């Protein structure tokens, strides 16, 4: 009976994991893009923007069409800092490309990771402009620049990239400000009204993107790709691409922020504090989706000047950086963009501990080993109770076999006799299940820490393990993990039933195959945990045997 329950528990644990991964996948946007040829984008009709006259408190989005290719008169302005290399088009003043210099495309490809792009898939572009009743540089504006390349100089902490637009006496200076050691970009519009009439308008910032093409991430990684909105009332909420298809969002909020999320990276739009902004979404042609925000109206009298500034964070979900940006701009909970699933409450302290250890040892693999040891120490007494119960079960196996043979034709009498034996020997038949029950939530939480934390992306361990976030290329760790499970089986009480015995013999091989697909960091944790468990179980088994002979 006890082995049946143990087998059932293990089976339920495996099924629970599979169901959890399936459930997580269902929570993500299921739609896959059907991408047309990019040249056809130019001819797409734009959805009409809603009327501004009815709601003058916040500007409405400039949501026309999709991203047009540069015309022949447009220039690409190249910008380089210590962390990013970007291209800004003079057509609309969009950030059309942005490479992350400290993050590789792949572990075996040193090319910088391209987060923003207007060529290839997925399309992801940052746009900013002005809208209003009078002249304003919107999506189709043509800006002038004094130079084609800007680079952050040694000893300088900021780099300004000005773009100039002028029409009918209204001059707009659009300035991108980049910073050293930062992925934060300020977007400032300076309006100089030399016209005879007063000028009124609003600033908008928006992100356009397509879903990732099918097959770009492994099946075991179901990280959310789509929009999100943070408000003081509802806190953090996701906006999937299917939500954008169903209805347009138009929501006024004070001191919020909006982000376009993907695995490991994101773009966040952060308004100035203390003002009410309108957040909006649009589903556009060519499987393109838009998430943006627009400011309250800016009034500039004739002969006067005014300006409006907002912020863009475009980079990796590095939690220290997100925390620093939040502190600098007085923004709440940017770290919520790092999604560890329903066990976030457990995953966050696990990541914190892992990060603190890595700061000391400077190796994420070693940090996983130390964290596993600390977890084992924390649950040492609980595990000891279970292992003592299993050791006692092992000791009474001959008596249990006699009971089974004596009452082979009367299952009720057999179970009653077994329970009396457990009571006499002070054995809890389910005691051996506790280590598994304890490890399941830790396992799931650590799984998401390893696959969702960009800090571990392409993080090397040693020897052949050069990326803890991807699977072992030679399957050595999964094979060692399977071998450790076989050793554990030898220490456990053997099942009496031959069918149960065969099932238990097969389980290590099933788990080995399963773990061949998991990140190497997770297998490293499980292998280390198994080795420590074997050592503890062997030690307790020897203690029980000595106490019996004393």
Curated annotation (Swiss-Prot):
Keyword line: Cell inner membrane, Cell membrane, Chaperone, Membrane, Protein transport, Transmembrane, Transmembrane helix, Transport
Compositionally biased residues, Acidic residues: 34-46
Example GO molecular function: membrane insertase activity
Stretches the record annotates as Disordered: 31-74
Lipid bilayer topology: Multi-pass membrane protein
Range of residues in the leader sequence: none
Subcellular location: Cell inner membrane
Residues passing through the membrane, by range: 6-26, 341-361, 365-385, 431-451, 473-493, 506-526
Top-level division of the source organism's lineage: Bacteria
Example GO biological process: protein transport
A matching Pfam family: YidC_periplas
Protein function: Required for the insertion and/or proper folding and/or complex formation of integral membrane proteins into the membrane. Involved in integration of membrane proteins that insert both dependently and independently of the Sec translocase complex, as well as at least some lipoproteins. Aids folding of multispanning membrane proteins.
Subunit-level organization: Interacts with the Sec translocase complex via SecD. Specifically interacts with transmembrane segments of nascent integral membrane proteins during membrane integration.
Matches recorded under HAMAP family: YidC_type1 (MF_01810)
Family indicated by similarity: Belongs to the OXA1/ALB3/YidC family. Type 1 subfamily.
Record's protein name: Membrane protein insertase YidC
Organism: Halorhodospira halophila (strain DSM 244 / SL1)
Gene that specifies this protein: yidC
């Amino acid at each position: 009976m006890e082995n049946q329950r143990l087998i059932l528990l293990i089976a339920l644990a495996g099924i629970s994991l599979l169901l959890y991964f399936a459930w997580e996948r269902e929570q993500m946007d299921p739609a896959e893009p059907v991408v047309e040829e990019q040249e056809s984008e130019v001819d797409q009709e734009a959805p009409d923007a809603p009327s501004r006259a009815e709601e003058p408190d916040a500007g409405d989005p400039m949501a026309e069409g999709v991203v047009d290719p540069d015309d022949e008169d447009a220039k690409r302005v190249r910008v380089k800092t210590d962390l990013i290399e970007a291209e800004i088009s003079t057509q609309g003043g969009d950030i059309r490309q942005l490479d992350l210099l400290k993050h590789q495309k792949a572990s075996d490809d040193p090319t910088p990771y391209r987060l923003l792009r207007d060529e290839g898939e997925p399309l992801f572009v940052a746009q900013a402009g002005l809208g209003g009743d009078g002249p304003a540089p919107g999506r189709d504006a043509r800006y002038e620049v004094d130079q084609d390349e800007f680079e952050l100089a040694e000893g300088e902490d900021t780099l300004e990239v000005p773009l100039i637009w002028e029409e009918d006496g209204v001059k707009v200076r659009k300035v991108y400000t980049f910073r050293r050691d930062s992925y934060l970009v300020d977007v400032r519009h300076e309006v100089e009204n030399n016209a005879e009439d007063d000028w009124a308008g609003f600033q908008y910032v928006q992100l356009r993107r397509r879903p990732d093409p099918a097959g770009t991430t492994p099946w075991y990684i179901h990280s959310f790709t789509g929009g999100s909105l943070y408000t003081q009332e509802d806190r953090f909420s996701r906006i999937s691409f299917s939500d954008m298809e169903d209805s347009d969002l138009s929501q006024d909020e004070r001191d919020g922020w909006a982000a376009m999320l993907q695995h490991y990276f994101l773009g966040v739009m952060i308004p100035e504090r203390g003002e009410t902004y309108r957040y909006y979404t649009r589903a556009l042609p060519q499987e393109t989706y838009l998430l943006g925000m627009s400011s309250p109206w800016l009034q500039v009298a004739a002969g006067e000047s005014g300006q409006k500034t907002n912020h863009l964070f475009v980079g990796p979900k590095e939690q220290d950086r997100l925390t620093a940006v939040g502190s600098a701009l007085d923004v709440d909970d940017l770290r919520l963009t790092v999604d560890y699933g329903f066990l976030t409450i457990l995953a966050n302290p696990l990541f914190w501990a892992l990060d603190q250890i890595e700061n000391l040892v400077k190796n994420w693999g070693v940090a996983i080993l130390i964290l596993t040891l600390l977890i084992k120490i924390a649950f040492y007494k609980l595990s000891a109770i279970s292992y003592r119960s299993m050791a006692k079960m092992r000791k009474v196996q001959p008596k249990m076999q006699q009971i089974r043979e004596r009452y082979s034709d009367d299952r009720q009498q057999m179970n009653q006799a077994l329970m009396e034996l457990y009571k006499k020997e002070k054995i809890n038949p389910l005691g051996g299940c506790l280590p598994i029950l304890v490890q399941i939530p830790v396992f799931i939480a650590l799984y998401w820490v390893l696959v969702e934390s960009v800090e571990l992306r392409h993080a090397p361990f040693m020897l052949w393990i050069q990326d803890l976030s991807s699977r072992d290329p030679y399957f050595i760790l999964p094979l060692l993990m399977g071998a450790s499970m076989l050793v554990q089986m030898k220490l456990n009480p053997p099942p009496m039933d031959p069918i149960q015995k065969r099932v238990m013999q097969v389980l290590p091989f099933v788990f080995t195959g399963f773990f061949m697909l998991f990140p190497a960091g997770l297998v490293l944790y499980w292998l280390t945990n198994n080795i420590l468990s074997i050592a503890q179980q062997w030690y307790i088994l020897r203690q029980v045997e000595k106490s019996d002979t004393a």
